[in-house]
């Protein structure tokens, strides 16, 4: 079983190379029309399986379509990856939508709403005291 350092190095290499493949070799219109980024790579300890989390500026429906198209093209992506890196076996890959960014944005929106409500409440209290 590889150590954490090796996992981190291989994950970093995979992220770099897959990003280059998405930018230069893959011809999917949705990817070229929207900003698509690899946010995270989960690589199994045996280096055989790789989950690639994608973020995008696209709407939710389009994001799901992007992930679906990437999963359809994963065999050609894996083939290109095999040509670019030296590994005994290129890991099986699966693309997933990274919902962490969306959840974070919704939490920030809720916090802003609470802040605005609190400010409005404070203004009403000051007006009532006057």
Curated annotation (Swiss-Prot):
The keyword Protein biosynthesis does not apply. GO terms for cellular component: cytosol. Pfam families: RBFA. GO terms for molecular function: ribosomal small subunit binding. InterPro entries: KH_dom-like_a/b (IPR015946), RbfA (IPR000238), RbfA_dom_sf (IPR023799), Ribosome-bd_factorA_CS (IPR020053). Keywords: Cytoplasm, Ribosome biogenesis. It is found in: Cytoplasm. Gene3D superfamilies: 3.30.300.20. PROSITE patterns: RBFA (PS01319). One of its GO terms (biological process) is maturation of SSU-rRNA. One of several proteins that assist in the late maturation steps of the functional core of the 30S ribosomal subunit. Associates with free 30S ribosomal subunits (but not with 30S subunits that are part of 70S ribosomes or polysomes). Required for efficient processing of 16S rRNA. May interact with the 5'-terminal helix region of 16S rRNA. Monomer. Binds 30S ribosomal subunits, but not 50S ribosomal subunits or 70S ribosomes. Belongs to the RbfA family. This is Ribosome-binding factor A. It comes from Prochlorococcus marinus (strain MIT 9215). The lineage of its organism: Bacteria, Bacillati, Cyanobacteriota, Cyanophyceae, Synechococcales.
